[in-house]
Amino acid sequence: MEMSSLLERITDQIAPLRGSGEVADYIPALARADPDRFGIAVAEVDGGVHGAGDWEAPFSMQSISKVFTLAMVLAEGDDTLWRRVGREPSGNPFNSLVQLEHERGIPRNPFINAGALAVTDQLISLTGDAVGNLLEFLRTESANPALPIDDEVAISERAHADRNLALAHFMASYGNMRNPVDDVIDQYVRQCSIAMSCHDLAEAGLLLARHGVRRDGSGYLSRSQAKRINAIMLTCGTYDAAGEFAYHVGIPGKSGVGGGILAIVPGRCAVAVWSPGLDRRGNSVAGVAALDHFTTLTGWSVF
C-alpha cells in the first residue's frame, strides 16, 4: 500500500480513540490542548515524506526533546555522562523522587526527568547554551528554520516546576549537578517547550533512522551511538509503559506529555504521531494505537 494511503487508513482506524484519555493538566498551558486532534507523519530515509490528519499542526515536544539532547551530548564524544546516568528502565513514574533517593542521586536512565536534567546539565557544560544549540540543531534537521519556543508553555512549566526542582536539588546534594540548579531548570523547561509538528519531528528523527547521519549527509553520531540511543528509546522511552509499547509496537519510541511520540524504524523511516489525550502513564492513547496499526500494516519491527 502506498504510504500516504496507509496513513489515511490509520487515521480512519483510530478515529474512535480521538478525544480519549486526559490532557496533561499539571502544566496549565498544556491543559488547553484539544484532545480530538490527531496527526501522523512518516519521513523515509530515501527522502519521501508523508502525512495525514493534523500533521502540520505544532505542539509542545516536551520529553521528546530528551532524545536530541542525549544525541548532542554523545556527539561531543562525552561518555562521562554514563557515570551520572544509568541505562535501565525505571518501572516508576517519570518524575519519581523515591527511586532517585534509593539510588543515591543517580537517575535510572536519561529519559526520566531526573536523567534528562543531568543530560541538560552536561550539555550546558559542553556548549554553554543547551537550548540554543538544541533549537539550532532541530531547525536544521527538520528543515524548518522558524521552529519556535512556545513561551507561554515555558512560562507555565517554569511556574509549576516544583517536582523537577526537587529532583535537581536532590541530585545536587549527591554531587550529580555541575551547574546552578535554577539555570538547569530554566534551560530544561525551554527545551521541552520547543514547538514542532509531526512533519518537523519525523524529519528530525531521520538522524536515528539513518544510523546517525544528518540530513546533509554528514556523520553526527557513530552507528554504534545511534543504535544505543534507539535501544534506550525502546526500553525506556515511554515511561513505565515501555514493555507494553515494545510488545504492541515493536520499534523504538519516545513520548512526551504534549501528546507526541517519535518512533524509529532503523534503516527505513522516522514516524511522528500526535494526539493530546494521554493514558494514565502519560502516553498518547491515539498515538500508541496509530503506531500499533502502522507496524502491523507495514510488518516493520526491530524483532
UniProtKB/Swiss-Prot annotation:
It catalyses: L-glutamine + H2O = L-glutamate + NH4(+). Substrate binds at residues 63, 113, 157, 164, 188, 239, 257. It is an enzyme of class 3 (hydrolase). Belongs to the glutaminase family. The keyword Heme does not apply. It comes from the Bacteria. GO terms for biological process: glutamate biosynthetic process; glutamine catabolic process. Coiled coil: none annotated. Keywords: Hydrolase. The gene is glsA. Pfam families: Glutaminase (PF04960). This is Glutaminase. Its EC number is 3.5.1.2.
